[in-house]
């Protein structure tokens, strides 16, 4: 028999409201509508299917305050993470929202109506309270950054009536709702289930620790990875799910099942661990593995951990009696080469040789194509990871040249394009400033805002091409540090590699060699907002390479760029 849901009853709103579907669908068409963000969609799905039981909607102020201050809903149930629906004052005013209003919640991906929210209250988001009490207060924490940079100024609280399920087109058979997973466990005859949460690929050590946990408790294993929103830079869920599927046959037959969880993680450490335990309880698990630094975001810019290594375990232990799910404390396992086995580190006798490969080392080996031993991971898993994470010699990159007009960046870009084409191995795309202005940004002017927009368009194109394995050479003026930083983040965020080259040719040289007389026109006032004349150029603070055409030949500069790429592994090494 599966575990009792949190709060006693599974709040499966989809099943509850199915008899009224036609009525609710018709009403949703005529109500004011709010189009949800990706994170809001993840939250809504788990509200509607009961994954967030006992919630029946987005939190009102009483629930929000109780969760932030005491880890409890207003009804007294333990709940550790604020589940809120944020909206701007502009949206609230335009839709004429107030307490008692009914609001359609819409999917941004396909414009489908998913639910109707009856508004209980609209309250100002106390971001400072949420940041401090829920996430610890460090402004570098990703959840706090999201609060400060993305979340709107008001929260809308109220209960949900479900209209339609979210559409998914990937791994549909593995996306069990809590009710479906409970039925599946019952069909298999499972009464004791250890749930394992992960946002990373699984290797031999993970298989070993989950089997050990199941063996000690005479239980089965639910591999329950997150496929919603995880930490930026994580391996994509498509790759991870293929790797989980490849790993599954390595378990004893009938021991483990794989189910996917469309959760938007907050990387909230102790608070998140409690939340994860509640979610797994709602999915029918009786036991939940909580690891070292569970759901922690890593380190801040000072190299400090956001949470203590065992804070998450202590937090779940504090509420274990009320949570109603047994916590299995993750004991890190290590490989013993002399006996070809894995053991928990605290069970290894002194002096016995052990081997480990860190996540950083694994990423390095994937990047360079170095050997990944079978004692660490299974060949079928490594094969999948290599397919999605090719070595650098097969990856794309963006060379972003910035400098004054006539600094020589266009000449460098063209020469570099020829050199890379001769090198072969990847397609090469050239994005010169004038070309982009003509083809992509013809409607933009030269205000600071328009210049920023132009650079972001270049970054978007560069990121998509780089992710597909191409070499991109961009050569805009890009005078503002803010725009260049955003461009780097955009390319890196899409999985690409970005190199900023500052063509630091002095302004005097650029003017002196200007055969088109454009600087002269700007000096006479015939051209306004001209970089270097009446608009500033902010020199890069973090260029990967700085060159100067007044002191170096184009050929030598291109050679410097090639050497930089070679040193980073972007060309085949014999």
From Swiss-Prot:
Gene Ontology BP, a term: sulfate assimilation via adenylyl sulfate reduction
Entry GO MF terms: adenylylsulfate kinase activity; ATP binding; sulfate adenylyltransferase (ATP) activity
PANTHER family: SULFATE ADENYLYLTRANSFERASE (PTHR42700:SF1)
Activity regulation (UniProt): Allosterically inhibited by 3'-phosphoadenosine 5'-phosphosulfate (PAPS).
Span list, region N-terminal: 1-169
EC number: 2.7.7.4
Organism: Aspergillus niger
Pfam families registered for this protein in UniProt: APS_kinase, ATP-sulfurylase, PUA_2
Binding residues for ATP: 197-200, 291-294, 333
Metabolic or biological pathway, per its Swiss-Prot or TrEMBL entry: Sulfur metabolism; hydrogen sulfide biosynthesis; sulfite from sulfate: step 1/3
Record's protein name: Sulfate adenylyltransferase
SUPFAM superfamilies associated with the record: Nucleotidylyl transferase (SSF52374), P-loop containing nucleoside triphosphate hydrolases (SSF52540), PUA domain-like (SSF88697)
Main location: cytoplasm
Catalytic activity as recorded in UniProt: sulfate + ATP + H(+) = adenosine 5'-phosphosulfate + diphosphate
UniProt family annotation: In the N-terminal section; belongs to the sulfate adenylyltransferase family.
